[in-house]
Regions:
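Non-transmembrane functional regions of envelope-associated proteins
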Residues: 2-316, 358-428
Length: 593
């Protein structure tokens, strides 16, 4: 009774369900869910924003300009051109976290410092004073002669001018080599450049070593609301302990600064983006959020954050997960055409592409050159450049194209688990194998179809693939268990049948019905030692009756199963000879008659 209880199908179904649930909680099926999530993203069709353009620092640009990193006056040149073309927002993804030192810059500054403290700076005034003194004492012939020499000499005619020219040239050289100042001036003139910063993730243990610069504090979010008791539940954006902001010379002139951090999934794929990061007691927006806000003429203080819910930009509501991450929508190519057109930096600088193309556009600048950036794995591309990922994020925000995991999604998953468990425990054991296969297949396909429809039609991600895996695994294991139980029963039945046939064969043999006995022995399976022993005795009975042809048949049958049993090989040879002798003897007697 106990054995039947533990071997019943409903216990097997319950056990399989418990094991799968435990594995799910441990993340064993996350890869399956992500694979179907990526499939849903690729299958969903939306139109990307036509306001976004990309200018790429590509291989052609680096080959035609200079090796990377470029002098920042080259970045300034592009910003100046785009400003001239009337762009709406410029999103610069190149990090400017350290001052750029051009070759010779330090020497020029040393010369300027030396010039400022040396006597050269006083020479023009001294020359003027000397001239005045000579003119005042000009009545003396000797002084008059010196005055005439002085007035005609280069001391009076050129030295002061040359010193001033040298001083001016030194300052011009410093300005020409100070690419940070050139870029800062371009950013200041443009008034619409959004720069990138990087935050260092970690858990704060105290207070920061130093406060961030004022221009970073001005880019922190102030409209923070908690409508779902997120603070009590510990639902905050990801925390950081350090930051790499743009250098002050650039940061103070930027229209906005946003973080460029990404949060890859466990398999390295970038499926979602943290729209907000927490730096101690302040919250900072992503660069995609800042770019979208600027394109809508919104300042950072007009970005509203609902903890564990969403981010609001004017009339736009970007729904997020509990950590303010947006499930980015990745736009697929349309008939071979990329979702976002990428132009070469070199082509824009040299005028091959008219600036009118970028009028009122959001222009994103970033690297696509080999070895410059690190490509990211996304649901639609295994090597997408970060500037392209940013384009998808900005478009997702502006179009409100993003995937969400609904609050009831967990309940739906639990309901699917319960359905699968009840099916495996109660219904499947009552079904025949073929019917069970069809029903299981229909249920799995129903879950897949539900997942697909929710993703493609409603941009909702409900994790139903693990319950589907439970159905498939449960069906395979329970079917395998049934097969093994059936095989074990069949083996037991075969053993019982073999014993019955062996006993019948012995009974027929004792009655002298040797042919019937041989027939029963041949039905025994498996042919073990007991059956071989019985057949050996049967062969001896056939020998005694001089039915050597049947003796040979018995031994041949035995040899197929165990050629080395006793002395059957020698007896079989002797029986064959005796059979031939009998046949020859019978033939000779007939001829003599």
């Amino acid at each position: 009774m106990k054995t039947r209880f533990w071997s019943s199908d409903w216990i097997a179904g319950l056990t399989i369900t418990i094991v799968v649930v435990v594995l799910t909680l441990g993340g064993s099926f996350d890869g399956l869910e992500r694979a179907f999530y990526d499939w849903g993203v690729r299958s969903t069709d939306r139109k990307p924003s036509d306001k976004i353009a990309i200018i790429a620092i590509d291989d052609e640009s680096i080959a035609n300009f200079e090796s990377w990193p470029w002098p920042r006056d080259l970045h300034a040149a592009l910003i100046d051109k785009l400003t001239e073309g009337g762009v709406k927002v410029i999103g610069q993804t190149v990090l400017f976290v350290d001052p750029q030192r051009q070759a010779g810059m330090d020497h020029i500054r040393d010369l300027i410092d030396f010039f400022s403290t040396a006597s050269f700076d006083d020479v023009p005034a001294d020359i003027d004073a000397l001239g005045a003194m000579l003119e005042f004492e000009g009545n003396s012939p000797a002084v008059k002669e010196i005055l005439e020499f002085y007035l005609q000499s280069s001391i009076n005619t050129r030295m002061s001018r040359d010193i001033e020219t040298l001083k001016s040239r030194l300052f011009e050289a410093e300005q020409a080599l100070n690419s940070d100042a050139i870029l800062a001036e371009s950013i200041k003139r443009s008034k619409n450049v959004v720069l990138a910063a990087v935050f260092i993730e970690g858990i704060p243990r105290g207070n920061p070593d130093a406060e961030l610069p004022d221009y970073m504090l001005q880019n922190s979010l102030s409209e923070i609301r908690d409508r779902v008791a997120a603070q009590n539940k510990g639902l905050f954006p990801f925390s950081t302990v350090g930051a790499l902001p743009p250098i002050p010379e650039l940061g103070i002139h930027a229209a906005a600064v946003g973080h460029l951090n990404s949060k890859p999934d466990f398999d390295g794929s970038v499926r979602w983006e943290p729209l907000v990061l927490q730096y101690y007691d302040r919250f900072y927006p992503s660069i995609s959020l800042q770019i979208a806000a600027k394109s809508l003429n919104l300042d950072v203080n007009e970005i509203k954050v609902n903890l564990a819910e969403s981010v609001e930009l004017g009339s736009l509501t970007i729904k997020t997960d509990s950590f303010l991450q947006m499930n980015t929508f990745y736009y697929s190519d349309n008939a071979g055409a990329p979702a976002f057109q990428v132009d070469s930096y070199f082509d824009v600088i040299t005028g091959k592409i008219p600036l009118e193309k970028y009028k009122d556009k959001i222009v994103l600048i970033g690297s696509t050159a080999t070895g410059v950036g690190t490509p990211q794995v996304t649901p639609i591309n295994t090597a997408m450049e970060p500037v392209l990922t940013l384009a998808h994020s900005v478009s997702s925000i502006l179009n409100e194209d993003f995937f969400t995991a609904p609050e009831w999604g967990l309940w739906a998953q639990m309901g699917a688990f319960l359905m699968a468990m009840l099916y495996l425990m109660l219904l499947m054991p009552r079904l025949k194998a073929g019917v069970a296969f069809v029903v299981t297949l229909v249920l799995v396909l129903a879950l897949v179809a539900t997942h697909y429809v929710m993703m493609t039609n409603y941009t909702m991600w409900v994790q139903l693939m693990t319950p589907g895996a439970l159905l498939a695994i449960g069906y395979l294991l329970i079917t395998t268990k049934r097969f093994l139980v059936t095989e074990r029963g069949k083996a037991r039945s075969d053993e019982e049948s073999a014993e019955s046939n062996r006993m019948l064969g012995i009974a027929f043999q004792s009655q002298g019905q040797l042919d019937m006995a041989f027939e029963k022995f041949r039905k025994c399976s498996p042919v073990d030692e007991q059956v071989l022993e019985a057949m050996y005795n049967l062969a001896l009975d056939f020998e005694r009756k001089r039915q050597f042809n049947k003796v040979t048949s018995v031994y041949q049958y035995m040899a197929k199963h165990n050629k080395g049993f006793r002395d059957i090989e020698s007896r079989m040879n002797r029986a064959q000879k005796m059979e031939e002798t009998v046949m020859l003897g019978g033939s000779g007697g007939h001829a003599g008659a």
